[in-house]
Amino acid sequence: MNIVIAILSPGAMGSAISARLVEHGARVLTSLDGRSASTVNRARAAGMEDVSPETIASADLILSIVPPGEAVALAKALVTRLRESRHKPVYIDCNALSPKTKTEIAGTLAETGCDIIDGAIVGAPPQPGEKGPRLYVSGDQSGRASVLRTLGLDLRQIDGPIGAAAALKMSYAGINKGIMAIGTAMLLAASRSGASTGLYQELGESSQYSLF
């Protein structure tokens, strides 16, 4: 029997991950009510099935991959449906949120009886023939996400509570931005002093500075 996964919503990341899951044998559900024509076409191209909001609760796992500002509202909108469903899917919030907000979402969904997992996607949407982004998961029930590893996703489990995966993503992003900011400042300083050509040459030869 195929694993059934609901992905909300089919944006650039959600549809690309859906395509990877479908490629590896999963059945992927979504709800396209009120969505734009471009979103509908993207979802269909990824092999996603348009189902009623009520059917979403029948999935084995629900992956929330929405704009960060919509994540809390989505969780609240699903509470009644998930609470009343006899089938209890695993809910993985994969959005770029703070650890505090991830904990808030877990609290919102606690009454549903569903297992809640904190997820964090690091990397670009998966492309055909490429490994794709890393999906970090944390929380007491994070082991229940392991099936995603068999469906083509690069799943990384963190031994930490809800919020740990979110903290990893925030820290990683902060380090990258800090490195780039320092690098840009140094390149500008070199340029002002007439050393930019030599600096670029040196950076090109020094593998440890290949980021720049």
Residue ranges of each PLM-predicted region?
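NAD(P)+-binding Rossmann beta1-loop-alpha1 motif at the extreme N-terminus of oxidoreductases
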Residues: M1-S58
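Helical "substrate-binding/catalytic lid" subdomain
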Residues: L168-F212
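Rossmann-like NAD(P)-binding element
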Residues: V51-K100
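Glycine- and other small-residue-rich loops at beta-strand/loop junctions that grip anionic moieties
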Residues: P10, L32, S64, C94-N95, ...
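Hydrophobic beta-strand scaffold residues
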Residues: V28, D50, D115-I116, L155, ...
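Rossmann-fold dinucleotide-binding core
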Residues: I5, L97-K177
